[in-house]
């Protein structure tokens, strides 16, 4: 029997404060499917930086759940996000993880698509074939400070609502003028929440990242002992953070 949203809410409400999540959140297949449906298929997701595709026709693939998304720059320098699925028989359109294409050509039956997703050619179709109805399915895409975000939902949450809590923090760094100097992929053999848990706590920072700790105030590290706001110095740290936020709004 598959777990539904109501059962998931019950499990969440039974969670003890300041404790790790129940084991089911990390190993249950149904919960993972709900994660994909309720979070990754509805929320804005960062996929890369514009400097990764600087030229006309440059593209890369981004995998999200079971979906493969083509991120590509067209001749007018607009960036598009298309599902990597031919509308004819569902074949993958792009087989390489990255590259440069001036035209998408399906390797199965040679349907071809322009970079904006419209059909260029569909061989031997009937006279009543309407190419406008068979363009590549696209998803929402937004560029903010050089960062590319996509949203798979048909009714996405407003991008401004999504980005506003971090807007000032991101704008300070001038990422729109940045370029990627190096890329590295670190596959994680585990649930995505494990990686997020590791990022959100700094209890491990002392033994695991001594150089990082050497350039931060000790109380900053302590305040993130088991996650944001859980350490004994969190009140003092939060005051400092709030003061900084006030200053950031004035910039």
Which positions does each model-derived feature cover?
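Non-catalytic accessory segments flanking enzyme active sites
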Residues: 21-65, 69-70
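Rieske [2Fe-2S] iron-sulfur-binding domain
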Residues: 52-154, 160-169
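Short, Lys/Arg-enriched N-terminal segments with co-localized hydrophobic residues
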Residues: 1-2
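Short, contiguous pre-domain boundary segments
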Residues: 8-23, 176
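C-terminal catalytic domain of Rieske-type non-heme iron oxygenases
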Residues: 72, 147-251
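A residue-level signal for conserved active-site and pocket-lining positions in enzyme catalytic cores
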Residues: 35, 141, 195
